[in-house]
């Protein structure tokens, strides 16, 4: 049975709601800057990251249903998990209109999610490293593209983060501060 988890709620828990079709598993389009130089074969391609893209589901209604509950469910921004990728989630927003009149009348409609380009492991817990006992710790990216981790440092003194034996980040905790968050996806 097809289902999604949206706003931390399983679609199968909404009376009368059916997820009749899930989106295909796709890779987002790469943003590129292409430069053509006269007299040079080909072009220079600069990769600029990935585009946000649409994932569309088809929904239906059956039996007893509350259209207002369905309308409320399919709104806003949240993490979404599709049952054909039930070990991953996407950060998504519903931005397009949904024809709920068609849904109520013909009991079918489409819902389009604007998803950010990366999907994340659903059950990946936080890693905790005690630097009093471990002076170094290796963390591997389990994905197939570059990783943009969120790192929370707790402690005092000087902390240095290396990537492939190259110092990437050094942080000195100011007096009285014991925690800092490095969100590499937001470059914050």
Give the location of each predicted region.
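Intrinsically disordered, low-complexity segments enriched in serine, threonine, and glycine
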Residues: 123-188
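Beta-strand secondary-structure signal
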Residues: 54-58, 110-112, 150
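Solvent-exposed edge beta-strands and adjacent loop segments
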Residues: 1-54, 86-102
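Solvent-exposed loop and beta-edge segments used for protein-protein assembly and interaction
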Residues: 49-51, 74, 103-107, 141-145
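Mixed-charge, glycine-accented linear interaction segment located at domain edges/termini
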Residues: 2-6, 114-116, 188
